[in-house]
Structure formats: C-alpha cells, structure tokens
Amino acid sequence: MNFSIEIGPRYQNKKCDIFITEATFGLPIFSHPFDKDEIKKLLESVIKNNEKPHLIGVYALGKCQRILSLLRDAGYDEIIYLHGALMKITDYYVSEGLRIGKVKNTSDLNLSELKNQIILCPPSALHDKWSRKFKNPVVPLV
C-alpha cells in the first residue's frame, strides 16, 4: 500500500480497529516533494531529451498505477510502455475501473522507433540486461 499526505482520486479513508504498517520513509526526517511537481519535472525532461527514452523504476503494486494516473492527470496522453512484470497487476487495476490511458508491454516496443517514450519498469530492471536494449536512456528518480 502506498501512503501519501496528498489527497488524490485514489484516496480512501478507511475506519479500522488496529492499523499495523511498515513505513520506512514515513518518519518526519524524510521530506518528499509533491507528486505533481515531480511529474512536471519528468514531462519537462521528456520534452528536453526528446531523442531519449525515459526509464522509470516503480513497484508493480501501487506505485506503477499511481505514476500512470499522475501522468494522465498532467495531460500526458502518449502510449506509456510497461515492463512485463507490471502488466498483470495494472490490468487488474484497469478491470477495477482505474483509467490509465493507453499502455503497452515493452515487448511491443519497436526499438528502432524509440525516441522519447516513457517506460515504467521494476527498480531491479534498471540495472539488469533488460535495460541495456535502450540506448542512452534517461533514468529519473521517482
């Protein structure tokens, strides 16, 4: 589960008797920028580096769908490519009503036409042989 101090379209306030969580980055010493500001920076980078793909490491459950939604909310309507490990859970979110626009598996990506696509993948894929097929990618931190 992702936690956020920002209220968005996927925010749900749930009543519970006991709440147990692990929140490594929930301590007050961690100060996180606002999502919309980070998405704006990403989209500015896509425009500035329009000949390079952007590889973004995200977790399959929650973070991937959050980034997809934030990109769409910011007006990005191009195809967003997903690593195969992100497809199944994202398809489930879509079946439950999350509108994320057009996404495709990276296996459908024509590398010869690769320019300024946004490609989401698990963080571990950023450093394995899968990512080597993308020439000179931009790898922003999310």
Where are the model-predicted features located?
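A short acidic (Asp/Glu
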Residues: Q65-L70, Y92-Y93, S131
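Residue-level preference for the first positions of well-ordered beta-strands
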Residues: I18, E51-L55, I79, N116-I119, ...
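Short, charged, surface-exposed secondary-structure boundary motifs
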Residues: I5-I7, I29-S31, K88-S95, L114
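The feature marks the mature, well-folded catalytic cores of soluble enzymes
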Residues: I39, H54, E78-Y81, E96-G97, ...
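His/Asp/Glu-rich metal-coordinating catalytic cores
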Residues: M1-P53, G57-G62, D73
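Short internal beta-strands
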Residues: I20, E78-I89
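Short, surface-exposed basic-aromatic patches at helix termini and helix-loop junctions that form
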Residues: S69-E78
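C-terminal regulatory/interaction regions
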Residues: D73, S95-G97, N105-V142
